[in-house]
């Protein structure tokens, strides 16, 4: 590969004036610092840091655990974390077309006490910058801004909650770190020194961090004389006043680093100055090679003058391993010398940001109506998976800015007039402001948006006349129904089709309005009378049902569900799921989809399939149960849909899926450690205990298993899927005779044999679940000598072999006493006699003792460990450094 270099020497008479204390254009943000606290100067650097409260619309503040405080600088002590939403963004005012050094610092410091390391994505605008997966890292990038605003976004990708400690921006000269294309992502930056001192501002006017780099095969060279540093790169005097040469004069001076993936392109910057006084008969001359190929030279450094050897085109290393060598020439009497080196990988940000006018327009709309939707952060249109709720965009080419084509703010609680900010959305095709409380007149500027095809203003409190320009606009559909004060005073509210026939567009006669209101009042009175006569009591016994041959119930015989929760129409379900766009999973009931209620509340929508083995009876059972049970460890019901053949249950959204996914590793690459597993089963047990003891009459779940333990964004466990649940209808009743239902492997043998259902049937199933989290093995495995997990564990226990029982991925990182107690508890739950099984109250008590025993060993383990082993060299508060050879 051909490589080109430029030589920059500072032997010119003009020396650039370094203003060490100048922070002009610097943005230094202490994330998590209270808005009430004044800006402060950091003791080590003198840099002025301010609170982030005005730069971000979401998140909560935190602080590192006390044991970490002595290890970090003041700006790193606090942080902001984001438990809500998927994307949370900082909005920064910058100068367009300016070269910026951007640094984001992430130090976990066990701020939440959970010992769960980070794993989330970092975006600049709509483009992925990097993935944060280390407990302690500084991400750095050099880029040229495209506009006067910059958004730094933290995007949740799994179970860990995004956080950030510090955000810093430093403007740089345009002729620094020039690339053919793309931006420069920091790989390493080192100065050749055997000290442990890190160098940054004020020594470095751009606040670059220089880390010492040295090898035992080198000799340290220093000078007290002033070294003229590079005009272009303005290197610190303290960096260029030190260098190294090989101890053996004929040896090469090597710097080694790796890049991933191996095809990654990079730029290197080698900084050299002669800082030794050479005698008349001494010569220092060398070449520079990369992986054995000549790249620059021969070169003789000039005394006390800095030269920077810079790549003009990006390089690449075979296999991703790079070895830069400074090699003495035959002519040279002295060994090669090196002062400092930097390297960056090339990162492309191909996705253009949304059209600037559209962004300004939608933000003005947001500000006018005070919309605080959690998803309305970052770029409105891209990336597509983070599209703002209620918008549709056109993004035909990543090199062209996306445009907003549809805005749906229906049922969003809007008040006031229709804002003129909408007219800035000049590419809008569909505008839906229906079912709000908008007042004032229909504005004429809507007719000026040439692209508009559909305007839905129905269900508001608008008044006055519809502008003729709107009525006369060809090809546009206008709906203003449900606005009783709109009148057509400027001629007929009729617009002509292109074929010349007339069609009513808006008809709101006063007489019709009065008649409609009268009919509605009459219907409402009749409905209330009938409801009073026919409504069954929620707490009463369920009525008997006539079963149809296909397992579903004749709809005519099914009583209505009485609920204070919200009942949704099927069309609302379609809207909330964005036409069933995102599938969360599939069960016996049917498909489960992701959705939003009121534009902000995430929900999971379970749709009953017509081919489902579960029918209306189970649907109704689940709704009626969830209406009368409320517990932090039971999944909450947001609402339901019961419209014709369309049945749906709308639950609170559980962002981290089910326990089975995490145990099997299909959800992500993290493994739950023993303490986290205990916490999850304790919370699940508390939910069951509430069903057994907190409900009147008591409830039996009948289908306790790992797929029915759901985890929210805070990793709190909640019991789900109550379609098979049954209650004891008579006070004091100890069992109920039922048709056997449940999941094979989890099913209580006594219940299966007798058809007698008790709370102890749930206890048996919970014991199986407990063995699953202990062993991480299948409940039924025909390859084992004893296929059923309970029998297999029993055999292993007779041998005293608990190591073979435990999940090997835990790497024996647990308290043995805690484990033994949990295993014994699980086996007691599996007793063939239900009378000898513990109650769920006893189970909760014993599990808490297990957790206390685990916590007492000093918290030596992390809650989650990576399955993959990544070999990196890290020190607290630093980045990955290259190896000196």
Swiss-Prot record:
Residues 531-885 are cytoplasmic. Belongs to the protein kinase superfamily. Ser/Thr protein kinase family. LRR repeats lie at residues 403-424, 427-447, 451-473. The keyword Phosphoprotein applies. It is a single-pass type I membrane protein. Glycans are attached at residues 22, 93, 135, 194, 228, 250, 254, 281, 287, 424, 437, 456, 461. The chain crosses the membrane at residues 510-530. It catalyses: L-seryl-[protein] + ATP = O-phospho-L-seryl-[protein] + ADP + H(+); L-threonyl-[protein] + ATP = O-phospho-L-threonyl-[protein] + ADP + H(+). The modification Phosphoserine is found at residue 737. The lineage of its organism: Eukaryota, Viridiplantae, Streptophyta, Embryophyta, Tracheophyta. Residues 578-851 form the Protein kinase domain. It is found in: Membrane. It comes from Arabidopsis thaliana. GO terms for molecular function: ATP binding; protein serine kinase activity; protein serine/threonine kinase activity. This is Probable LRR receptor-like serine/threonine-protein kinase At1g51820. The modification Phosphothreonine is found at residues 738, 743. Residues 1-20 form the signal peptide. InterPro entries: Kinase-like_dom_sf, Leu-rich_rpt, LRR_dom_sf, Malectin-like_Carb-bd_dom, Prot_kinase_dom, Protein_kinase_ATP_BS, Ser/Thr_kinase_AS. Its EC number is 2.7.11.1. Keywords: ATP-binding, Glycoprotein, Kinase, Leucine-rich repeat, Membrane, Nucleotide-binding, Phosphoprotein, Receptor, Repeat, Serine/threonine-protein kinase, Signal, Transferase, Transmembrane, Transmembrane helix. It is an enzyme of class 2 (transferase). ATP binds at residues 584-592, 606. GO terms for cellular component: membrane.
């Amino acid at each position: 590969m051909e490589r080109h270099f430029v030589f920059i020497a500072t032997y010119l008479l003009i020396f650039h004036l370094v203003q060490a204390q100048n922070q002009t254009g610097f943005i230094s943000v202490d994330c998590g610092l209270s808005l009430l606290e004044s800006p402060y100067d950091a003791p080590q650097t003198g840099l002025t840091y301010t609170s982030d409260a005005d730069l971000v619309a979401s998140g909560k503040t935190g602080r590192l655990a006390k044991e970490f405080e002595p290890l970090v600088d003041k700006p790193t002590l606090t942080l902001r974390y984001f438990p809500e939403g998927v994307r949370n963004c900082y909005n920064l005012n910058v100068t367009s077309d300016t070269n910026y050094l951007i640094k984001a610092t992430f130090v976990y410091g066990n701020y939440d006490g959970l010992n769960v390391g980070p794993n989330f994505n970092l975006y600049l605008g709509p483009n992925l910058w990097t993935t944060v997966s280390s407990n302690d890292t500084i991400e750095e990038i050099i880029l040229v801004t495209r506009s006067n605003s910059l958004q730094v976004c933290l995007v949740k990708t799994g179970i860990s909650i995004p956080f950030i400690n510090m955000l810093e921006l430093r403007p740089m000269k345009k002729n620094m770190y020039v690339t053919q294309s793309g931006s420069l992502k920091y790989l390493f930056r080192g100065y050749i020194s055997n000290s442990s001192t890190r160098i940054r501002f004020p020594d470095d006017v751009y606040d670059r961090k220089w880390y010492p780099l040295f090898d035992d095969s080198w000799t340290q060279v220093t000078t007290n004389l002033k070294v003229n540093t590079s005009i272009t790169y303005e290197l610190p005097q303290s960096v260029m006043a030190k260098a190294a040469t090989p101890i053996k004069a004929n040896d090469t001076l090597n710097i080694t680093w790796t890049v991933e993936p191996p095809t990654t392109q990079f730029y290197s910057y080698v900084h050299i100055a002669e800082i030794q006084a050479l005698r008349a008969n001494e010569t220092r001359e060398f070449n520079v090679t990369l992986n054995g190929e000549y790249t620059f030279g021969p070169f003789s450094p000039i005394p006390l003058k800095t030269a920077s050897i810079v790549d003009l085109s990006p390089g690449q290393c075979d296999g991703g391993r790079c070895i830069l060598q400074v090699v003495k020439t035959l002519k040279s009497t002295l060994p090669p010398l090196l002062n400092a080196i930097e390297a960056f990988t090339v990162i492309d940000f191909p996705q253009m940001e949304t059209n600037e006018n559209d962004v300004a327009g939608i933000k003005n709309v947001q500000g006018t109506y005070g919309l605080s939707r959690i998803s309305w952060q970052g770029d409105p249109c891209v990336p597509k998976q983070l599209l703002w709720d209620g918008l549709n965009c056109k993004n035909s080419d990543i090199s062209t800015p996306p445009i907003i084509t549809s805005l749906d703010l229906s049922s969003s609680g809007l008040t006031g007039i229709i804002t003129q900010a909408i007219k800035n959305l000049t590419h809008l095709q569909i505008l839906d402001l229906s079912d709000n409380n908008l007042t004032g007149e229909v504005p004429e500027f809507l007719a000026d948006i040439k692209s508009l095809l559909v305007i839905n203003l129905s269900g508001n409190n608008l008044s006055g006349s519809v502008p003729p320009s709107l009525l006369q606009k060809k090809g546009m559909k206008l709906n203003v129904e449900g606005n009783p004060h709109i009148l057509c005073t400027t001629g007929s509210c009729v617009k002509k089709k292109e074929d010349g026939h007339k069609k009513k567009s808006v008809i709101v006669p006063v007489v019709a309005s009065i008649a409609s209101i009268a009919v509605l009042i009459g219907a409402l009175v009749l409905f209330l009378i009938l409801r009073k006569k026919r409504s069954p009591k929620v707490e009463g016994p369920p009525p008997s049902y006539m079963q149809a041959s296909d397992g579903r119930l004749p709809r005519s015989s099914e009583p209505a569900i009485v609920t204070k929760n919200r009942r949704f129409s099927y069309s609302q379900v379609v809207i909330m799921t964005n036409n069933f766009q995102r599938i969360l999973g599939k069960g016996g009931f049917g498909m489960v989809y992701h959705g939003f209620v009121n534009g902000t509340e995430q929900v999971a929508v379970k749709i009953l399939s017509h081919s489902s083995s579960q029918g209306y009876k189970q649907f109704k059972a689940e709704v009626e149960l969830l209406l009368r049970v409320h517990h932090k460890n039971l999944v909450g019901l947001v609402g339901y849909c019961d419209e014709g053949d369309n049945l749906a249950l709308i639950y609170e959204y559980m962002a981290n899926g089910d326990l089975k996914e995490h145990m099997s590793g299909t959800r992500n690459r993290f493994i739950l450690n023993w303490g986290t597993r205990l916490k999850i089963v304790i919370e699940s047990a508390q939910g069951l205990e509430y069903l057994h003891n907190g409900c009147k009459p008591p409830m039996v779940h009948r289908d306790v298993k790992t797929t029915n333990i759901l985890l929210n964004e805070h990793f709190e466990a909640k019991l789900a899927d109550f379609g098979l649940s049954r209650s004891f209808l008579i006070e004091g009743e100890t069992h109920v005779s039922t048709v056997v239902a449940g999941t094979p492997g989890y099913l209580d043998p006594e219940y299966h044999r007798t058809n007698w259902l008790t709370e102890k049937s749930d206890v048996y199933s919970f014991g199986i679940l407990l063995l699953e989290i202990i062993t991480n093995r299948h409940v039924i495995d025909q390859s084992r000598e004893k296929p059923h997990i309970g029998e297999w564990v029993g055999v292993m226990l007779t041998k005293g072999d608990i190591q073979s029982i435990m999940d090997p991925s835990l790497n024996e990182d647990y308290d043995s006493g805690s484990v033994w107690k949990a295993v014994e508890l699980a086996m007691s739950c599996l007793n063939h006699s239900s009378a000898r099984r513990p109650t769920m109250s006893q189970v909760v008590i014993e599990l808490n003792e297990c957790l206390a025993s685990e916590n007492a060993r000093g918290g030596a383990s992390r809650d989650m460990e990576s399955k993959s082993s990544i070999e990196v060299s890290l020190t607290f508060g630093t980045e990955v450094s290259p190896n000196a050879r």
